[in-house]
Amino acid sequence: RSSDLGESGSGKSTLMNIIGVLDRQTQGNYYLEGQDVNGMSDEVRSAIRNRRIGFVFQNFNLLPRANALKNVMVPLLYGEEHSKNGKEHAMEMLKMVGMEDRADHRPNELSGGQKQRVAIARAMINDPAIILADEPTGALDSKTGHMVMDLFHKLHEEQGKTIVLITHSQELAQETERIVTLLDGQIVADNGGEH
């Protein structure tokens, strides 16, 4: 578990977009699971984004007209696993985050914490190597935010997921093993995993 810490404009979103294979870096190399990502075609990069990276956003980015189950299944539409096994797998993901009883609820029928848990289930559906969480507790109250962070800790400890938390909150960053601090697009501090 690591966090990229910095104020607005520090470069956190740019770094997230590079790690998430949304943007290309202008210099240096980026290796994901031993592969140089920069030299890959857009088609291969898109497949990597879908299969190896899960995204969790502050504002959830759920489809308003789709229920929780269908929201979790969205990444499967772009992959190889479709309807039959996909529905069962999506229910497993909802169960993992404690939301199986809300599978038929639309986002407007869910609390902020419930929406974020659905978003985490969606991020996990393709068994990604990395979960990028951009201010995942920013729209939540303190108690619900701690519940979401506990879920990230569990995913890291029990499933070995790499969680990269993008935040401006020093308090939230302290809950991670490694803190990388950005300022004006530069890394100004990296605790290397030691607090």
Task: Give the ranges of each region predicted by the language model.
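ABC family nucleotide-binding domain
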Residues: 3-182
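H-loop (His-switch) and adjacent beta-strand-loop-beta switch element
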Residues: 179-192
